Amino acid sequence: MSGLKGYIKPYWKFVILGPLFMLFEVFFDLLQPRLAAYIVNNGVVERDFNVIEYTGILMVLVALLSLIAGVGCNIFASRASQNIGGDIREALYKKVQTFSFQDIDKFKSGSLITRMTNDVVQVQTLVQVALQGLVRAPCLLIGSVIMALLMNLRLGLILLGTLVVLIGVLIVLMRFSYPLFSKVQQKLDMVNTRIQENLAGIRVVKAFVRSGYETKRFHNVNRGYTQSSIKASRFIALNAPIMTLIMNVCLVGILLYSGPLVWRDSVKVGDLVAFINYVAQALSSLIMVSGRLMDVSRANVSAQRIQDVLSTEPSIVDAKSEGKSALLGEHISFKHVNFSYNNSKTAEDSILRDINFEASRGETVAIIGSTGAGKSTLVQLIPRLYDVTSGSVVIDGRDIRNIPLAELRHNIGMVLQDSFLFTGSIRDNISLGKVDAKEEDIIEVAKIAQVHDFISKLPHGYDTKVGQKGVNLSGGQKQRISIARTLLIKPSILIMDDSTSALDSETERKLRNALKGLIKDNITFIIAQRISSCIDAEKILVMDEGTIVGSGTHQELLENCTVYQDIYRSQFGEREVSYEHK
């Protein structure tokens, strides 16, 4: 929890006022047994109704003051816990925004969701109970023991012996509970990851009739979570009964010892009543402490998991502004670039190996190759979604690791393979990167992306609502909206990562023709599976198993690149290859 102390500081007033009000409540609660003893000794035994009446009224007033103090504590504790929880959740969200793809891969999205929700709630709950129960219980415990000892030292020693036993039991339970709560949170991560994955791929599950299989997989992880929760709950379940048993044994012992004392008038009846009340307060306080310490054990696990995220240094470090001239995207070069996801420099772990090429403004660079060749990984290095393991990517003479991320990414437009759309209108999705875009600009890029006609036919046009992840749109429609979104920001470097795979040949042809006039001032990268998508590019890079095995124009590659010839032959047939060679 020490790493999260900084989130408490802004709400120090609530953190102080809450316990302060609780101290008043404890003080009033400690008065009640004394007042009860006075009523019994001087009112009931002496048969003085006036004492009973006036002392009874005083007890009611004390109870009301205790109530007011308790409510005040609850209000301040709630405000502190809710605000602290909100700040931690926001800090986690902001931290995740700084993560590279590699950092997100490390934690897994399901685990990050658990940390931002369930773990924050655990810490939030701890703050609440700490400002209430963890103040009330120790103070009431100490106060009750002191009052009991002052009333009767011998009886008080019985109470102290009982407390030592209870504390020993509590330490044992705490020692075994911490690792169990840690395992529960890990199992919850697995459940959330499975749910998220299943919901994201529900259409695939249904299409392949895999509901039964997925249900079984969920059953296994859910069962693991349930069993871990049951094991942890056993310690919680043992806590209260054991404490209650020891408390009752203590009360019986006190009554057995004090009974003869009352008969001999060595102890007044009212004092015995007050003493038993103090014993009950002390022991119930310890039970409360044990319950709260279980919360502490559980929250410590959550706090550590939160701190793991907050203390993670992003694998991609943002560069400071050097005051150099603005990035124009005139020239880009890859120099001996190697990349592996685990930053290993061994050849067998490398996804990309010794990548070298250059491109200048006005050039279109197409990248083609088999699935898994490293095409998408290569272009993801340009906006620093991942960082190179060795070598460098240089834009306008500057290593991109020395360019502030905001400046770098502001000049790069990327249409990802997965055309992700946000919940909202089509207009909102197109203007995502330029929220103040004019209507005519939105329509212009939509026309270039060959999506304007489709949008115009919708009942609400550009204000048509898009479902989560664009579920109410086809793959081709989502791709074209994503292309329009990227074109609107007018990037210096345009990256289209297999972004026309869902388009038919005619629509793709129209899109390529419309883009020609727009991208003449850009450096454009096109990743494609189809040769027809990159045949007009000034430079085509052919990739195979993480390396560039060919570079040149379409005609040059047909003449000297075996891999390119194989791809061409698989798509167009032997006759066309022969024809190109004539």
What positions do the PLM features span?
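Membrane-integrated ABC transporters
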Residues: 1-31, 36, 44-59, 65, ...
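Transmembrane helices of ABC transporter permease
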Residues: 10, 14-27, 62, 68, ...
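Hydrophobic alpha-helical transmembrane bundles that constitute the permease/transmembrane domains
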Residues: 23-31, 64-71, 123-126, 130-142, ...
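Short intracellular "coupling" helices and adjacent cytoplasmic loop segments at the cytosolic face
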Residues: 45-47, 76, 82, 90-114, ...
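Helix-loop-helix
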Residues: 48, 147-161, 231-305, 309-310
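An intracellular "coupling" helix at the cytosolic face of ABC transporter transmembrane type-1 domains
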Residues: 98-102, 118-127, 131, 135, ...
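ABC-type nucleotide-binding domain
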Residues: 325-582
